[in-house]
Amino acid sequence: MSMPGFEFGQSERLTIRLKGLIRSYPRGVGILKEFVQNADDATATRLMVVMDWRQHEGERLPDARLRRVMGPALLLANNRRFSEPDLQAIRHIGESSKLTSGPKTGRFGLGFNTSYNVTDYPSFLTNGAIYCFDPHRNAAAVAPGYGMGWKLAQLWESAPDWPAVFEAAGLKPGAIDHDGTIFRLPARTTAQASESEICDEAYKYA
């Protein structure tokens, strides 16, 4: 027989964990190398890199807070979709699908964390949906979560400004599916860096 008690235990803020992790990840051209490696591990045959310097419209978004990610961004697109194990692996810090899929080294897993050297809000599009990570919970996430996902079909109908930012890397306007994966890394601004618990340096795309 056990006596009722109350919950108590240690925890760690996700932002602080990420701050520690990115110290071991490359910056600059090393970030591109990580995505090249991930694309190769996923057996992609194409990788497109696009620098979108535009400030996009932010009037019709699934969450008004997403306006903070509508500025200049680096987009990386390959011609392989996420598998279900990939989607699960990318949600677990410090893991990759290599743990369960043998030779598929780092497939959209560990190497993805290098994104946080660039942005606090990495997002990606695959299998007819857009996913956005939000460790600070100030762009899209709602506690207790640290991110949000939306179906393309619903976005085009009600919040078209959000999927439109992926058009620079090949998403067709109005498309409810995409044959591949597009990552989008909006540059961390000076204002965002000043309040970030992950990295206090703005990211300048050269």
Language model features: what each stretch is:
Residues 1-176:
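GHKL (Bergerat-fold) ATPase N-terminal catalytic module, capturing the glycine-rich phosphate-binding loop
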